[in-house]
Every structure is written in structure tokens, then in C-alpha cells.
């Protein structure tokens, strides 16, 4: 390649408004710049993250190798492809690189669009992606969305969700439709729905008339879980921009054996560099002992739960049970929650409105305020969980866990988490009641 744009321009390349930089702030829609921000207290991986210093350096090095022709696009893509497949190369899985999780959903529907008529049963968009329904609608399937929460914002029981899913699937099959079930592991607030046992039972019952796409775009699943899904014959969508904290907009659709032998995917250079940055964090995390990961996750959860419980300005939402039986029975780190959703309250026992919660979320990211701790903080974007109410999300990431292994790393992780919640409480008090 004779000439290339600068690394920061490439990291936001792709013609999507969500990663385009605001000309005034230099930030994308998620409040992230295209360069590292090591001073930020980053707990927003359920939405997006600022690129790490090591990820930025890796992407810049790859750009240089492409410029001096010591590497090629095809070889670079193949290297990332092989690394993501890892121990699953024996399963004959096809990978399709796409810009976003939404694009992965659309590609999955496209693979089934010849099986007319097609019905899609999916989780409501408020717990997955806001553009998913619109993206898959272009292929004209019948779409049925299932709510994960009741009107008061509390989670519906797994039994009720499963029953609704089964009824929708059975009705569509009775009409002669092929059904695509989009199950989520994990949702914006960390839920699995419908249950894995429900998805497996429906798959076994309807076989050729039924397909499953696992929306694992948060990528908060262990290698054993991913392999088990693929062996089950389920498609899986993952991203490098949530748990892995790579730059926003990098996704993959994994197609197990039995789907198209050849898939057309995106070969965009910006997408390649975003995945290159994400893979740095993927390698770091995969190198950790599982016992270390579990210890850090348990300690972190204890700190966050205790701080939220002792403050009347916070209400921790019920934590979902991450039950993956009968998919696999072995214990792994992904049985532990890494997303903690909480509602903000005025001192008069009234929850903040969605608009007020959004304002707190935005102000957390600013540093030019006279506050107890003026450092820039990031939480997951507010998620609607009831009438007029939203929840913020405190998310643990692969990068944070890897950093916590370092000397005094766990102490820093705890201190940073408490600092973010302290600033959040300070902002709540300054939102007009």
C-alpha cells in the first residue's frame, strides 16, 4: 500500500455515524476519542470503551507493516481469524467479519432468507441493540419480540419468558415457517434469554425448521461456552468492542458446519485495525489462570454490591442467574456477573427520570467540574427498565481484569470503582428534584 490515512482516521473509518467524531468534541457517539485516555476510569464496557494504549500501539504497528508491505490485508485477516477460532478449528466453523453486532444479525437472517417464509423470535431491542429489528427487517421476515422485564422494570421469570418463546415458535412452525430464534447471552443488563435448555429443546424438536443465533455480542462467555454453542449447531455473534474493550464497531458472525460453505465478509481496513486492537486484550485475558479471573470478579462484585447497598441514592437491580445447563456443566468464570445495573434515586425516594439519568451519565465523562473527584468516568449507557426509568450499568471488562493481576492492581480497581460511584452520587445530588 503506497499511502494510508493516519491511524486515528482509520480507527473510525467505516461510514457509520455512531463512530464518526463530533467536530467540536473529537468524540464519537459513545463519548470515546480515537486515541487512548489512560486517566479515564472506564467501567462502560457494556456499551463502548476507549482504545487501550497497547491496542493503539498494535494497530499503529499493523498500519506500518501494511505501508511497507511486510504484511498484507489477507494475511492479517487470516491471523485474526485463526486466533478467534483457537481450539474450535476442528469444528469447520466459518467466520464472517462485519462492522457491528447489528450487521451480524442481518447476515444471519440473510443466510436463512431463502427458507421462505421466515419468522424471527428475538429479545426486545431495549436489552440487545437498538438497530437490530430495522436491520433484519430488510429481508422481510415476520418478527416477534419478547420482553425480558415486566412493566415495573423487574425481570420476568425464566419460565414466563421460555413459555412465550415456545408459544411463538410453535405457532410459526405450524404455519410452515422456518424459525430463527435469537437468544441473548448476555443482554445489556447481563441476562440470558430464553434459557439455553429452552433453545436446545426447540432445536431438537424442530430440527430442519429451526435455527438459533446466539447474540453473544457482549462476548462475556468463556471459550468452553463458545465451543459448546458451536457444537450445538448454533450461530454465534460476538464483538471485540464490549468485554474486550476494543474500539467500537468490530464484530464476527460464527457459522457452524451446515451453513454456507463460503461467506462474504467485510474487508474494511478500519475494521481490521479495530480487531487488531481488540485482540491485544483478548490475548492478555486468555493468558490468565481461570482461578485468578474468578477471584478478581468475586472481589469486585463484593465491593460494588456493598457500595450500592449502603447508599439510598442507588438501587441495584436483581442480578440474573447465568445458568448454561444443559449446554455444559463445568464451572467457569462466565457464571459470574460482570454487569451490575442500578437505578439512581433522589433523596426523597423518587427515581431519577430517564432524562436525568442520561444527564448524570453524560456529566460523569467530563473532567472540568469542581467535584470531589474530577476524573473522567465512564459507565454503560442508561437502559430503559420500566416506565420513565433507566438504569446505569457498572461493567467489568477483560482489560480491567488483566490490569488487576498486576502489583496493587486489585487495590486500584476497587479504588477506581468507588471513585466512580462517589462522583455518581455527587451528581445525583445536583440534579434538580
Please annotate each region the language model reported.
Residues 249-293:
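A conserved active-site cap/scaffold subdomain adjacent to cofactor or substrate pockets
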Residues 3-20, 49-103, 114, 125:
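Conserved N-terminal alpha-helix of the aminotransferase class I/II PLP-enzyme fold
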Residues 22-67, 190-195:
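Polybasic, low-complexity association/targeting segments
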Residues 2-32, 36, 116, 166, ...:
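Conserved C-terminal alpha-helix-loop-beta "cap" of PLP-dependent enzymes
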Residues 44-47, 124-125, 183-187, 344-345, ...:
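Structural motif
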Residues 104-112, 275-282, 417-427:
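Buried hydrophobic packing segments
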Residues 96-268:
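Conserved PLP-enzyme active-site core in the AAT-like
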Residues 48-49, 242-244, 258-260, 347, ...:
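Short, glycine-/Ser/Thr-/acidic-enriched flexible segments
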Amino acid at each position: 500500500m503506497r499511502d494510508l490515512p493516519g491511524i486515528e482516521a482509520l480507527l473510525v473509518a467505516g461510514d457509520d455515524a455512531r463512530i464518526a467524531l463530533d467536530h467540536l468534541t473529537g468524540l464519537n457517539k459513545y463519548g470515546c476519542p480515537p486515541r487512548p485516555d489512560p486517566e479515564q476510569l472506564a467501567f462502560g464496557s457494556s456499551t463502548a470503551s476507549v482504545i487501550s494504549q497497547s491496542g493503539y500501539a498494535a494497530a499503529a504497528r499493523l498500519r506500518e507493516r501494511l505501508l511497507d508491505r511486510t504484511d498484507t490485508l489477507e494475511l492479517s485477516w487470516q491471523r485474526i481469524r485463526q486466533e478467534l477460532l483457537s481450539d474450535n478449528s476442528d469444528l469447520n466453523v466459518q467466520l464472517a467479519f462485519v462492522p457491528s453486532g447489528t450487521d451480524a444479525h442481518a447476515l444471519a437472517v440473510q443466510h436463512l432468507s431463502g427458507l421462505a417464509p421466515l419468522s424471527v423470535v428475538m429479545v426486545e431491542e431495549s436489552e440487545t441493540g437498538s438497530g437490530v429489528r430495522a436491520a433484519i427487517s430488510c429481508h422481510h421476515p415476520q418478527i416477534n419480540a419478547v420482553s425480558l422485564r415486566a412493566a415495573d422494570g423487574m425481570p420476568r421469570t425464566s419460565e414466563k419468558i421460555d413459555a412465550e418463546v415456545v408459544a411463538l415458535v410453535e405457532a410459526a412452525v405450524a404455519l410452515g415457517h422456518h424459525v430463527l430464534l435469537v437468544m441473548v447471552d448476555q443482554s445489556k443488563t447481563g441476562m440470558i434469554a430464553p434459557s439455553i435448555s429452552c433453545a436446545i429443546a426447540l432445536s431438537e424438536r424442530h430440527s430442519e425448521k429451526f435455527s438459533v443465533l446466539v447474540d453473544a455480542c457482549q462476548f462475556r462467555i468463556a471459550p468452553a461456552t463458545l465451543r459448546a454453542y458451536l457444537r450445538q449447531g448454533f450461530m454465534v455473534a460476538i464483538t471485540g468492542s464490549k468485554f474486550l474493550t476494543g474500539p467500537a464497531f468490530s464484530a464476527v458472525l460464527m457459522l457452524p458446519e451446515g451453513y454456507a460453505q463460503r461467506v462474504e465478509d467485510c474487508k474494511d481496513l478500519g475494521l481490521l485495525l479495530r480487531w487488531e486492537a481488540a485482540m491485544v486484550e483478548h490475548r492478555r485475558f486468555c493468558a490468565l489462570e481461570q482461578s485468578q479471573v474468578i477471584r478478581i470478579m468475586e472481589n469486585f462484585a463484593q465491593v460494588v454490591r456493598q457500595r450500592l447497598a449502603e447508599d439510598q441514592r442507588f438501587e441495584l437491580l436483581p442480578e440474573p442467574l447465568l445458568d448454561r445447563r444443559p449446554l455444559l456443566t463445568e464451572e467457569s468464570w462466565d457464571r459470574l456477573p460482570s454487569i451490575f445495573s442500578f437505578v439512581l434515586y433522589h433523596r426523597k425516594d423518587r427515581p431519577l427520570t430517564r432524562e436525568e439519568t442520561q444527564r448524570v451519565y453524560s456529566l460523569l465523562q467530563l473532567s472540568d467540574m469542581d467535584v470531589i473527584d474530577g476524573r473522567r468516568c465512564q459507565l454503560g449507557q442508561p437502559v430503559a427498565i420500566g416506565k420513565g426509568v433507566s438504569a446505569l450499568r457498572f461493567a467489568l471488562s477483560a482489560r480491567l481484569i488483566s490490569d488487576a493481576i498486576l502489583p496493587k492492581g486489585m487495590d486500584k480497581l476497587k479504588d477506581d470503582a468507588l471513585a466512580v460511584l462517589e462522583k455518581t452520587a455527587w451528581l445525583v445530588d445536583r440534579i434538580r428534584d
